[in-house]
């Protein structure tokens, strides 16, 4: 549908009002939508291009406080050699530049970066855009789409409706259309600009640019059409604006959970604000004290370059439990570490997240940043960036070969054996049969098997195609009910009799930022709209109602386990938006989860073995120790016996409200042992003396602060 003229638009508005008053209000809304909203048709791909070193981009200030006061942000683009003639164009592109290679850059839009709507209508409101020429002799015209995100979303919905009605529209990636509509175009209509002349884009002129609620890093790239021919070049000089944490409120002290007696280890101190966001505002001496079986230096310096982080070396001083306290003298902030257990376990508990997303798919940051964040800013032992196999939004297109190669290369580049582990992975994102991450073992060459290819379009077909490879498939948020209606999650074949590759499904993500999929009625139920900010999220939740599957859907983790799937319980973040701690985001309903791997070392081989053997635990964020044995076999094992002796322990980061051992057999699920309310540590010692049938056990934990954890199951086959 083409552009509607002003007079016709007036007539259509009158008709819509008439229909609203006389006929049927919903019909009037549909009529107005069909006639007044333009169909999105032009979504030419953002070019992958070699950047040019021509001008220079500078941003002032370079950071605002997340959730703080709006301030004007000036992006100054200095014209390069040869100048800019009349008709030339400079486009400011707020988003993220993806470096597919040194000479292959592409501007990508950031979904939900939180900076708010840029506008040109009202200088008295936040986010007003003004473009300033260097002199009165130079006239610059400015064009941009008002409410670009909202209007493009409506245009996209109109596109979907027209396709449903039979209109043939060429497939497109919606990000391209969104990115094109978000750009600010400054055209030189009178005069010329010499080399060195500045053009200023003022974001929030007057009332300031409203910062997002959470931490984010956004590129302010410039595209230049020097001749006015419509041929744009991406300048290699990038501006950048950061939203950072506010005033220091708490020190987070992150130490290993399991260490050997007399072992030396590294400790991370993070300064966070009252909402848990990393704060760069603290610098100076930090005083350190020790409790129990740990010791080390009495102080450490947090430098300005540390941007709210400081590392120091400590050590175990024998067997037992220890904690580390850190305080900032004169600043009134302090913190205590997670519990440190000093014992000869023969393995470590590696903490990290197997489920994050980058700008390659629908995240907000480049893959390399996410690896840096995990290792240097969060103190994790491992991570995986599991970008989607497609960009869907109604028009699915598989990742390109160049994108997939970047994903795998980034994982390899950031793997440091003995220090930090990365996994090569991607997400198989089938909205009808369920999402799952595909991980490749240490010696396995990755293969890309998108669900858009008919050969890999079902969970069974995916597993069959992976058969014979060292790979693992991890289902996640199975209880997520799609907005279009109920979805029965397809867990795929349970064993080899049902299909090839069934044994590759070793783990299931019981919890993420989307919520909890343990069982119907569980705490923290699935709420995808919980990831949306403020009023928008509240509205979506009100319209959609419950977003989790029904009690008879078969989509919960307990359903899968009861049906014969042998899956260890883990947790992740499924982080898409925040550049900060995925366990915390002020705009989102739930914290992101993390997974502990009981592994022998910081290597891919050891981490892979721990996952394959299901020696794992998952939490909603804290570093709890959750560990148990059945007849001496570690959680995740499969054993044969006529009785079960269950031993173990849980050490929380706060008091433990409930620790329960859950058993399943033909009678269903039930808690056979419970304890809680006695402090941060619980010891498990329980016996099932006479087993009449095969069963399995797992642990579930609830802390006093509401955080949760899981470990297991362990399966017991009754000896005949």
Regions found by a protein language model. Give the residues of each.
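Extended, charged catalytic domains and RNA/DNA-binding interfaces, predominantly
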Residues: 250, 260-303, 307-720
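Ser/Thr/Pro/Gly-rich, low-complexity intrinsically disordered stalk/linker tracts of secreted
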Residues: 31-250
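N-terminal Sec-pathway targeting helices
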Residues: 3-26
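Short, solvent-exposed loop/linker segments at the N-terminal edge
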Residues: 63-70, 83-84, 257-263, 637-642
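Hydrophobic residues in beta-strands and at strand termini
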Residues: 79, 94, 188, 203, ...
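Short amphipathic alpha-helical segments that mediate assembly, nucleic-acid/protein binding
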Residues: 8-10, 154, 263
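Exposed regions on extracellular, virion, or secretory-pathway luminal proteins
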Residues: 9-12, 17, 149-150, 195, ...
């Amino acid at each position: 549908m083409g552009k509607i003229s002003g007079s016709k638009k007036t007539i259509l508005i009158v008709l819509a009002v008439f229909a609203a008053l006389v006929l049927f209000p919903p019909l009037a809304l549909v009529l107005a939508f069909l006639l007044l909203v333009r169909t999105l048709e032009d979504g030419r791909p953002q070019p992958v291009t070699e950047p040019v070193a021509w001008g220079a981009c500078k941003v002032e200030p370079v950071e605002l406080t997340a959730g703080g006061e709006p301030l004007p942000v000036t992006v100054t683009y200095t014209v390069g050699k040869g100048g800019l003639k009349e008709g030339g164009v400079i486009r400011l592109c707020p988003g993220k530049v993806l470096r597919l290679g040194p000479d292959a850059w592409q501007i990508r839009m950031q979904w939900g970066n939180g900076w708010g709507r840029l506008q040109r209508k009202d200088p008295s409101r936040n986010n007003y855009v003004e473009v300033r020429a260097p002199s009165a002799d130079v006239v610059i015209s400015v064009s941009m789409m008002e409410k670009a995100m909202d209007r493009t979303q409506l245009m996209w919905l109109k596109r979907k409706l027209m396709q449903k009605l039979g209109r043939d529209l060429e497939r497109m990636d919606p990000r391209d259309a969104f990115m094109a509509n978000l750009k600010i175009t400054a055209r030189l209509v009178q005069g010329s600009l010499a080399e060195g002349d500045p053009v200023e884009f003022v974001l929030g002129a007057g009332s300031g640019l409203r910062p997002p609620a959470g931490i984010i890093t956004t590129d302010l790239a410039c595209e230049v059409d020097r001749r006015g021919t419509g041929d744009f070049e991406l300048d290699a000089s990038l501006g950048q604006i950061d939203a950072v944490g506010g005033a220091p409120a708490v020190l987070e002290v992150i130490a290993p959970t399991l260490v050997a007696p007399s072992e030396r280890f590294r400790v991370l101190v993070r300064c966070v604000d009252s909402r848990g966001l990393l704060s760069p505002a603290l610098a100076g001496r930090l005083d350190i004290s020790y409790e129990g079986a740990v010791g080390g230096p009495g102080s450490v310096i947090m430098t300005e370059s540390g941007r709210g982080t400081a590392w120091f070396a400590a050590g175990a001083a024998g067997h037992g439990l220890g904690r580390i306290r850190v305080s900032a003298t004169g600043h009134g902030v302090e913190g205590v570490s997670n519990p440190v257990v000093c014992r000869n376990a023969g393995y470590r508990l590696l903490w990290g997240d197997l489920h994050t997303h980058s700008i390659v798919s629908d995240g907000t940051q480049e893959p390399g940043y996410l690896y840096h964040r995990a290792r240097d800013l969060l103190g994790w032992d491992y991570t995986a960036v599991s970008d989607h196999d497609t960009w869907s939004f109604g028009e699915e297109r598989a990742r390109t070969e160049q994108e997939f190669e970047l994903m795998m290369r980034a994982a390899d580049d950031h793997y440091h054996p003995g220090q930090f582990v990365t996994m090569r992975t991607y997400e198989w994102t089938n909205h009808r049969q369920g999402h799952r991450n595909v991980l490749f073992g240490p010696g396995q060459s990755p293969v890309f098997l998108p669900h858009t290819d008919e050969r890999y379009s079902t969970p069974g077909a995916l597993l069959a195609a992976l058969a014979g490879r060292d790979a693992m498939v991890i289902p996640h948020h199975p209880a997520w009910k799609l907005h279009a209606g109920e979805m029965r999650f397809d867990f795929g074949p349970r064993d080899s009799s049902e299909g090839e590759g069934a044994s590759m499904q070793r783990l299931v993500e019981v919890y993420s930022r989307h919520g909890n999929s343990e069982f119907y009625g569980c705490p923290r139920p699935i709420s995808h709209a919980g990831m949306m900010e403020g009023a928008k999220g509240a509205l979506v939740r009100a319209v959609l109602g419950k977003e989790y599957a029904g009690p008879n859907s078969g989509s919960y983790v307990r359903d899968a386990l009861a049906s014969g799937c042998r899956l260890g319980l883990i947790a992740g973040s499924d982080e898409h938006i925040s550049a900060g701690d995925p366990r915390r985001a002020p705009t989102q309903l739930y914290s992101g989860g993390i997974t502990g791997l009981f592994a022998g070392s910081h290597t891919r081989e050891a981490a892979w073995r721990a996952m394959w053997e299901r020696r794992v635990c998952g939490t909603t964020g804290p570093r709890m120790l959750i560990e148990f044995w059945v007849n001496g076999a570690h959680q995740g094992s499969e054993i044969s016996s006529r009785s079960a002796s269950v031993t173990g322990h849980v050490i929380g980061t706060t008091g433990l409200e409930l620790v329960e051992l859950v058993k399943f057999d033909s009678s269903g699920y039930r808690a056979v042992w419970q304890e809680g309310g006695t402090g941060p540590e619980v010891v498990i010692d329980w016996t099932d003396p006479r087993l009449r049938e095969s069963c399995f056990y797992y642990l579930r934990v609830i802390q006093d602060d509401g955080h949760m954890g899981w470990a297991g199951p362990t399966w017991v086959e009754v000896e005949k």
